[in-house]
Amino acid sequence: MIFITGDTHGDWISRLRTESFPEQKEMTKDDYVIICGDFGIWDNSKREKYNLDWLEDKPFTTLFIDGNHENYDILDALPVKEWNGGKVHFIRPSVIHLMRGQVFTISDKTFFTFGGARSHDIRDGILEVGDPRIKEWSKDPFKLFRINHVSWWEREMPNVAEMDEGIQNLRKINNEVDFVITHCGPASTIALYSHGEFKPD
């Protein structure tokens, strides 16, 4: 079995507890929950580690791609391993980050993974640690800003190497997969289906 959700932002317990997700009673570690970005790797706090241990103890395997709200300093420091045909980071033995531009075979289906997205909650800018405006702006509920390497990472957007690797991996399988897992679709596609509501950056 495979279940897909998104944007857990580190709150795995409320989303994936048995009361919210009773299907897990029939699941094993050979069944999967895929989280489509904004998984919630954030600060290595005791609470986050506790929650990850809780997730590891669930009967299923958790897979996730990155979104625009992840701590890329933590993710990028992890060793790169191979799993089911593609590159991954193991957060726990059964909590696995599926890296960008990869093709995985999971439950006899092929999945192309490409995480990342551009943050839209940064209208007032990206500030550096120590910027005196942080204290003042933090009190203003209308200020939309982030702090570099604290609450925002440039790595939220894919780089050319990741895009090239994705193209190469897709070519190896004649550009055919069963599923594409992404945090945010291409701007051109979103614009097409939004009936004029979506305004690209």
Description of each model-found segment:
Residues 109-196:
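Active-site-proximal loop/helix segment associated with metal-binding centers of metalloenzymes
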Residues 5, 10-106, 199-200:
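Core catalytic region of metal-dependent phosphoesterases/phosphodiesterases
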Residues 1-3:
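Extreme N-terminal starter segment of soluble prokaryotic enzymes
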